[in-house]
From Swiss-Prot:
It holds the Pfam family ADDB_N. It is an enzyme of class 3 (hydrolase). Keywords: ATP-binding, DNA damage, DNA repair, DNA-binding, Exonuclease, Helicase, Hydrolase, Nuclease, Nucleotide-binding. PANTHER family: RECBCD ENZYME SUBUNIT RECC (PTHR30591:SF1). NCBIfam families: rexB_recomb. This is ATP-dependent helicase/deoxyribonuclease subunit B. The heterodimer acts as both an ATP-dependent DNA helicase and an ATP-dependent, dual-direction single-stranded exonuclease. Recognizes the chi site generating a DNA molecule suitable for the initiation of homologous recombination. This subunit has 5' -> 3' nuclease activity but not helicase activity. The gene is rexB. InterPro entries: ADDB_N, DNA_helicase_suRexB, P-loop_NTPase, PDDEXK-like_dom_sf, PDDEXK_AddAB-type, Restrct_endonuc-II-like. Despite having helicase-like domains, this subunit does not have helicase activity. GO terms for molecular function: 5'-3' exonuclease activity; ATP binding; double-stranded DNA binding; helicase activity; hydrolase activity, acting on acid anhydrides. Disulfide bonds: none annotated.
Length: 1073
């Protein structure tokens, strides 16, 4: 074994490539080994250093891949399971285990995160040359017992599928021990680059290869100064030193110092030497020069967005200087927090990029399809699962409009479960659903699903055949291809990887579970688990892209220009978190009991060494310029400066406060089309910034003027979102079509209430005609109709029968009507509602029998009230009562408590009773009032009554009173009836004021409606909260941010409130006149 080390200012790759080439020229086969995370980049750099740009004798690869070269022929019929297959194995094991078989993990059997932990533990035990039986020092013996149970059954399933139970490295080690590879290995040389530690499995293999191979060459970056030190704890090179010294001791060889022809910029090595002195407690008699400080700089930005925009502008500047995208590298302190923002910002500046990170498949439509299919079977055709299955776009060939209609009908008819899905749709409503079309869609959905779901317990291979037949029937492959074809090229590459993973999971299922009997539910659950835990990685379509990855995966001298962002204290240094099933303390205890070449990694014990090594690589990652950046605000929370950056600042590395991106006329701002257009749109929205220079201000003013002129020529305009709740008027021709000018505008009291609640709600409901989802289940409207019908029959009954008999007969008759039978006898919920309503009817109806001097003149009386040629008000009055003197009163049944509030009426929110009075008055009828009757079952607190006597009955009847507007002149006729007269009596002139103001409310609304401009203005009573309908899903109204758009109601003090409102009404009426 040959151990090489060099200063970080030299190229270890060049040194090792030179060694590899020398052995290749002698006829040896050379394997150039790099870590998994660096193998792709290392292969490119190695090939670039070879004079012929390639070699058949030199293979750049990883340990595991190298093992395949030697063992592939000997294990041709056996494959290794990938992570997706292992997840399916463990899920199957946990499904088969009973709860009492697991003492610690029994509650986690179906937990996806637990299964992922088992997969990682299984692989980690393989790399550590351990089994679950070796975990003897866990905190709880029951924990080891559970792991032994799970791992043993998993290995049995793996053997059942004839998959490899050992790793590739273990197979190679066994082959070496058997002497079957001696001839090949004698002609083999290993060159190992980029490592600072080996796993136990790699150490064992390395020891065997050292005896069998011609040579093993290992290189590492270590300064000569560090190598000569006796005490290395906390040294910047501690990880590399420990690595090389341990190998030197084990294999009895002396490390050799060497150099490369290539020498990188001394500014980075000088910075490294100063840092090294800080960590080994020595001193240097020189400082960073001006040239050194120009090569390394620290940026401080306001937030992540500003930070990324500064980076993209800097990249574009480098492009103008003649560099290429592949010369740039962006390193992220925290990939997860930056990943969502990178795409939009880099695309705005038209910078191609590649993020070297595995992505989960869980959000892909194919995974959602599999999840919905499994849930549809498990939950017996639950509606939302079937709808999600169809909305994935992968089931059959349906038009979007057809699926919308089907979903609306499923909600309306409450189609749940196989029984309802299997029967023809027959129920309909006033909306007249297209039942023939819907039944065609139903058959297209139900037929293939029913064929699949009726599968009985059988072999996994047979179930998979049925599943493949189902996929063919619904045209899954064609639909997936159409879906991928409609997406961007980058997304199409992701789709290809997802499809490969999906087919791989099906193949694994067939191999492992093909000969095992199981139910369809278990089959789908296994495939779903494989899909949910799967990840994919795409490769860049071209090499000329900006590479983006986590900063802890970088190696020295990676790219000419490196931008490391997000280097806050929270992420630099990176704090390793142990999320496995075995704690660090347990790992350390296990390692004390194991033999050589058996070891579990203990992340926290090596954290400091690893972080120093990462910082060393990061500070030397660039060959020309290095930018280290941190946002002062990271994901909406402030963060402190990294201790490593504090060291650099103390050494004199300059800090630049980047601040907010300012618009200028520099090449970075105007040299890219999308970025230029984006800035012009921003200026159009926000105006020219005051802090611009006069030259910048002039440039952008002229550019914006020019763009607007060009857009006007094309009949286009710039978007403006600064007032996101500002609405545009409806086109006059649309208003004319919807509300013809030669006809009066049709209104109702409920439409007027909606208008004054929120004008935009009126627009949605009465102009666009949008409707809320309806349901076959009875709602408040149906309940009201039911009680109305009962009261109507009771009041029409002129027989001499007792009132209770009349009421019972009316209830029985209404219950037999088909419209009510359909909704109240369909299920238990409907029958329960019916019983509640019958109780309300029995409680409320007696009030009809109390006013013997009153006659019911009419019921369900329709009316039309014309307000000149401007408006026609239509409505239906529930009941009209008549006094003995012929005067009429209006009764409106309500299912909830309602009173006439003059303040609500003044603000347009309660015009119903006054509108009804106007309709009767218009016919020349005398009036005595208009009132609400709350249909209810009175509820009283018995604790309020000392004695349960007649007072309880009187209190119950007190709740059942008519409340509304009454004429003072009719008081003598009403005093002995069930009327609430306190503060509800109005003189004739006051009633005239109400009627006149009511007309003004209608005419004002008509005038606004005719303009076609509908405001988003839900009302607020207190100016602090919004009570009107905000329609958040449509308008994006946020009460705390958009309170200024709300319509403020007029609220007056309680003292003499009624008179004050009447006075205001009179004043406004006179003003209009």
């Amino acid at each position: 074994m040959k151990l090489l080390y060099t200063e970080i200012s030299y190229s270890m790759t060049e040194i090792l490539v030179k060694e590899a080439r020398a052995y290749a020229d002698k006829g040896y086969r050379v394997f150039y080994i790099a870590p998994n995370s660096l193998s792709f980049e290392k292969e490119r750099s190695v090939l670039a250093l070879l004079p012929e740009q390639g070699s058949f004798a030199i293979t750049v690869t990883r340990f595991e891949q190298m093992a395949r070269y030697f063992t592939l022929a000997k294990a041709a019929n056996r494959q290794a399971l990938d992570d997706n297959g292992l997840a399916m194995i463990f899920y199957r094991v946990l499904m088969q285990l009973q709860e009492d078989e697991l003492k610690v993990f029994h509650r986690l059997r179906t937990d996806q995160a637990f299964i992922a932990q088992l997969v990682e533990l299984y692989k980690e035990l393989q790399a550590a040359n351990l089994t679950a039986f070796d975990l003897t020092t866990l905190d709880r013996p029951e924990k080891q017992e559970d792991l032994i149970t799970i791992m043993t059954k998993a290995e049995q399933l793996i053997a059942q599928g004839d998959y490899d139970q050992s790793s590739r490295l273990a197979q190679l080690a066994e082959a070496i021990k058997s002497k079957s590879l001696d001839d090949e290995l004698r002609q083999t040389v290993l060159v190992i680059d980029g490592f600072t530690r080996f796993s136990a499995e790699e150490e064992q293999l390395l020891a065997l290869l050292n005896e069998a191979c011609e040579e093993i060459v290992i290189g590492a970056y270590i300064s000569q100064k560090a190598y000569r030190l006796a005490f290395t704890k906390g040294n910047l090179y501690e990880a590399s030193l420990a690595f090389i010294q341990q190998l030197a001791q084990q294999f009895q060889t002396k490390p050799i110092y060497t150099t490369s022809e290539k020498v990188f910029d001394v500014s980075f090595s000088r910075l490294t030497q100063l840092l090294e002195a800080n960590h080994d407690y020595s001193q240097l008699d020189w400082q960073l020069s001006a040239k050194d400080k120009s090569k390394v700089v620290i940026w401080q930005a306001l937030n992540q967005k500003e930070e990324l925009e500064h980076v993209t502008k800097a990249i574009r500047e480098k492009l103008y200087q003649g560099y290429r995208y592949k010369d740039m590298l962006v390193l992220l302190g925290d990939v997860a927090s930056y990943q969502l923002q990178i795409g939009p910002i880099f695309e705005k500046f038209e910078i191609p990029y590649y993020i070297g990170k595995q992505e989960p498949m869980s959000a892909h439509p194919l995974v959602q399809f599999v999840e919905s299919l499994e849930r549809g079977r498990r939950y017996n055709w639950r509606r939302e699962d079937i709808v999600n299955l169809l909305k994935s776009g992968l089931f059959g060939r349906f038009q979007e409009g057809e699926l919308d209609q089907l979903e609306q009908y499923l909600v309306f008819a409450d189609i749940q479960g196989f029984t309802k899905f299997s029967r023809p749709f027959t129920l309909n409503s006033s909306r007249q659903y297209p039942l023939p079309l819907l039944n065609q869609l139903r058959l297209a959905v139900v037929t293939p699903l029913q064929q699949l779901f009726k599968s009985q317990k059988q072999l996994g291979a047979s179930l998979l055949d049925k599943l493949m037949t189902f996929f063919k029937t619904i045209q899954l492959a064609d639909n997936f291809e159409a879906l991928a074809g409609s997406r961007r090229e980058a997304d199409r590459e992701k789709d290809e990887e997802v499809w490969k993973t999906f087919t791989g999971i099906l193949e694994t299922f067939y191999q492992v579970f093909g000969q095992e009997k199981m139910t369809l539910a278990d089959c789908l659950a296994l495939i779903k688990m494989g899909m949910q835990t799967a990840h994919y990685r795409t490769v860049p379509a071209t090499l000329d892209v900006v590479s983006i990855k986590s900063y802890d995966l970088v190696e020295p001298h990676s790219k000419p220009f490196v931008f490391a962002i997000g280097l806050s204290r929270s992420h630099f240094p990176k704090q390793t978190k142990n999320t496995s099933l075995i704690s660090d303390q347990e790992r350390a205890s296990i390692n004390e009991q194991t033999a050589s070449y058996q070891r579990l990694d203990v992340p926290s014990f090596e954290n400091i060494k690893k972080n120093h090594q990462t910082a060393l690589s990061l500070f030397n990652a660039a060959t020309q310029e290095l930018v280290l950046s941190l946002p002062t605000s990271l994901t909406n929370s402030s963060d402190d400066v990294s201790p490593y950056l504090k060291e650099l600042i103390a050494l004199g590395v300059p800090v630049i406060e980047k601040g907010k991106n300012r618009l200028s006329h520099s090449a970075a701002d105007i040299g890219n089309y999308k970025a230029l257009l984006s800035r012009l749109v921003a200026i159009n929205r926000q105006g020219i910034a005051d802090d611009m220079t006069s030259e910048d201000r002039n440039f952008w003013t002229v550019a914006l003027r020019y763009l607007k002129r060009r857009l006007a020529d094309e009949q286009l305009s710039l978007p403006a979102f600064e007032h996101h709740l500002t609405t545009k008027p409806v086109a006059p021709e649309v208003i004319e079509t919807r509300f013809p000018s030669q006809q009066p505008l049709s209104l109702s009291s409920s439409a007027l209430t909606v208008f004054y609640n929120n004008q935009y709600k009126y627009f949605l409901k009465y102009v666009l005609g949008l409707q809320e989802p309806e349901s076959i289940h009875p709602d408040a409207r149906i309940h009201g109709q039911y009680l109305h019908r009962i009261f109507e029959l009771v009041t029409k009954d002129r027989s001499n029968a007792a009132f209770d008999q009349k009421l019972g007969a009316a209830i029985a008759a209404v219950n037999q009507q088909s419209a009510f039978q359909q909704v109240y006898q369909a299920d238990a919920e409907g029958r329960y509602s019916l019983e509640v309503l019958k109780g309300i009817a029995y409680s409320t109806a007696p009030v009809l029998n109390l006013n013997q001097g009153m006659q019911v003149a009419k019921q369900e009386e329709a009316f039309e009230l014309a307000l000149g040629h401007q408006a026609l008000i239509r409505g239906v009055i529930d009941r009209i009562d008549q006094l003995a003197d012929g005067r009429l009163g209006i009764v409106d049944y309500k299912s909830s408590a309602r009173v006439f509030d003059i303040g609500a009426f003044y603000n347009g929110l309660s015009p119903q009773l006054v509108t009804y009075l106007a309709a009767l008055k218009n016919k020349g009828q005398g009036l005595f009032g208009a009132m609400y009757l709350h249909m209810q079952e009175p509820r009283l607190s018995l604790s309020d009554f000392k004695v349960l006597d007649d007072q309880l009955v009187a209190a119950a009847y007190k709740e059942l009173t008519y409340k509304g507007i009454f004429l003072a002149q009719a008081k003598e006729y009403l005093a002995n009836g069930s009327y609430h007269l306190n503060n509800t009596l109005y003189e004739t002139d006051e009633l005239e004021t109400l009627l006149a103001y009511n007309e003004q409310l209608y005419l004002s609304a008509v005038k606004q409606i005719k303009t076609g401009h509908f405001l988003i203005n839900p009302y607020t009573a207190d100016g602090k909260s919004v009570q009107g309908d905000q329609l958040k899903a449509i308008t994006r109204f946020e009460a705390d941010l958009d309170l200024g758009y709300a319509r403020r109601l007029v609220v007056l003090p309680a003292k003499e409130r009624r008179q004050a409102f009447l006075t205001r009404m009179n004043e406004e009426i006179k003003h209009e006149d």
